[in-house]
């Protein structure tokens, strides 16, 4: 399949630090590569405030359109959340040239669509899409109304708006009803596990930190792993046996893994990202319930990432939004094989409260120490 040619635009304030601007653009590049696009031009624009009509301003927009025509660009991606009228106004200027215009959420939704395997994931993406695209569709209906209605008349476009709203409202209710069935099934499974005495451990982390790799390394589950963002959208659950010398965990309890051991359930789900839009968090809330109700959280961190600390904070912000603040956490610093020297002492000091463990899922290093920490925490 041919790669679509893409222009990337990021609009930042004049107060944005160069390092932060660089990071924002790097992440947008990673998202675009994950989607499968070929980046031909990257543009950073500094503005005090976004342009009301087109976000990037008329002069810059004309410049971008000229470049897009010259470079035979198929998609313009703006690394911000645009208002419906802003993206609508840009689309009107480029639609005859065959160029698509996406904002940051459009791009993430396209990646989600590419990676969705289960019916539930597809439903969640559709729900997020309706919530994101709905206002834009209303804007299109309003434009039809203004064109068809004339002065002092009630045009067919106005009826179109109402029809669109009703259609999307009915579809949203139907999707939420189907998603709730999956959520109820998961709730019943959790209740059964609680009754049997199973402990649950949830793996969270920034996307591409190595969550699925950790699940595979600990349980041999065989979850899909790829060096790209959002490779995993669905919740995967696997059993992990923890050897223990503690006499309290010996015996014939159904949740025990035999003499001197404990079986726990390990779950892995969608990765987080900088400025993860609220509607996406809400759409995936049912699959994130495993994290909300876990007895222990393993926060997987790419220790070789130059933006490691910022990404730790962003994952914690999402957990706070999910109201996961009191659950015990272990920080699992992954990919130690990517560094010649890992600053263990400094990391242990900074994140002492989260019992840091250093591992390489790729080389199966540090996993026994992690198992011990999990057993001790539980």
Model-flagged regions — what are they?
Residues 1-108:
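N-terminal accessory targeting/assembly segments
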Residues 23-26, 49-65, 270-293, 304-318:
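Switch II of P-loop NTPase G domains
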Residues 31, 65-66, 82-92, 285-355:
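Conserved C-terminal guanine-recognition region of P-loop GTPase G domains, centered on the G4
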Residues 96-114, 120-122, 128-149, 337-378:
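Canonical P-loop GTPase G-domain recognition
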Residues 124-127, 131-134, 138-141, 162-165, ...:
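Alpha-helical coiled-coil heptad-repeat register
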Residues 148-246, 259-274, 278:
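Conserved G1/Walker A P-loop phosphate-binding module
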